[in-house]
Amino acid sequence: MTNVVVVGSQWGDEGKGKIVDWLSERADIVVRFQGGHNAGHTLVIDGVSYKLSLLPSGVVRPGKLAVIGNGVVIDPHALLAEIDKLAAQGVKVTPENLRIADNATLILSLHRELDGIREDAASNSGTKIGTTRRGIGPAYEDKVGRRAIRVMDLADLDTLPAKVDRLLTHHNALRRGLGEAEISHQAIMDELSSVAERVLPFMDTIWLLLDRERRKGARILFEGAQGTLLDIDHGTYPFVTSSNTVAGQAAAGSGMGPGSLGYILGITKAYTTRVGEGPFPTELDDEIGRFLGERGHEFGTVTGRKRRCGWFDAALVRQSVAANGITGIALTKLDVLDGLDELKICVGYTLDGQQIDHLPASQAQQASAKPVYITLEGWKESTVGARSWADLPAQAIKYVRQVEELIGAPVALLSTSPERDDTILVTDPFED
């Protein structure tokens, strides 16, 4: 038995929700370890859809403990709204099934406002990143700047005013420079006071809790958000998120040692998508790109934004396999490729007349790199709902085997529809 870390191996939206749901049924604890409510997914359980952005997937399953680790930035208003929405669907979220790290950073209204102000200014200058405007980046900035308000601060009203003053010294200077009105000390105190009573019962010392449960033999599932190519260090900077999204962050963002992580499962879409700005070597602006978007229902769970679509990029996923130490992948949305006459896979790039096997870190070089493709025959048969290799067309199996060879990692699970049971299990990550 081992613990499992789930990470996205592309630019997010790989289908982590279904796979995490499938795995969470067998886990005892599900841990979020980075990001915020800027990425979401939909779980379908007994025909009921649950849309989650901040809460770990385990929260909708009876008998599971959901944990929000110290690596997550938490908007308390979004947290409570999500809890209330689940309550309306008959799911009770209580301190019995949800624990939140006492040292996790809070996202406040001033973070959301700053995020929006910056994006508006960047849109006018052509330097937009394409954030969700939810305050994630500004909150991480305050965390690194050692001026953040953390969950534990809600319980210490004696020292909170001085911390708010320190926070506002920074933010009001920024706002003056941007031509925006300053924020009053009382406004932030009122905002924090309005959520403290409901948030504090969930607070816990997470590293201690997880260490205790690990020693008892609990199965722990670490649930990543976004994808490797959006990692602040390893992604297509600056068109990235504001946290580390790679598997190593599961340790740092939860307070557990790296030796506790176990099986690293990379969720990998059978083609490539991206939301927002940034380089995308295999992007298709043609009829095939539109086909992938429509067949794959490529719209964001949180923002509703249309996703850009393109061919599978084995060179990028190969990089993700290395950066995460991926043990095996879950290949999703294979069924979306049904009916295409031929399929292309990117195996590298040409840059300045030279062929290279990885995407450089340089923004200018990323923009100039051109994909090098191999072409495979497609298949006309349907793979929708396939639950065994015998249900798959020969060409679909050939495509999967080619992906494995090119990325240097085996397929552990294969998903053939949004339904959780339409999954071909090759290797059980918890038993590896």
Swiss-Prot record:
Supply one GO BP term.
'de novo' AMP biosynthetic process
Quote the protein name from its UniProt record.
Adenylosuccinate synthetase
Could you tell me what this protein does?
A: Plays an important role in the de novo pathway of purine nucleotide biosynthesis. Catalyzes the first committed step in the biosynthesis of AMP from IMP.
Q: Which organism is it from?
A: Rhizobium meliloti (strain 1021) (Ensifer meliloti)
Residues bound to substrate are 301-307
Assembly behavior: Homodimer.
| A single GO molecular function term of this UniProt record | adenylosuccinate synthase activity
Q: Which gene encodes it?
A: purA
Q: Which reaction does it catalyse?
A: IMP + L-aspartate + GTP = N(6)-(1,2-dicarboxyethyl)-AMP + GDP + phosphate + 2 H(+)
Query: So where's the catalytic machinery, residue-wise?
Result: 13 (proton acceptor), 41 (proton donor)
This entry's Enzyme Commission designation comes to 6.3.4.4
Q: Which family does it belong to?
A: Belongs to the adenylosuccinate synthetase family.
Instruction: List ligand-binding residues for IMP.
Output: 13-16, 38-41, 132, 146, 226, 241, 305
HAMAP family in the record: Adenylosucc_synth
Q: Which UniProt keywords apply?
A: Cytoplasm, GTP-binding, Ligase, Magnesium, Metal-binding, Nucleotide-binding, Purine biosynthesis
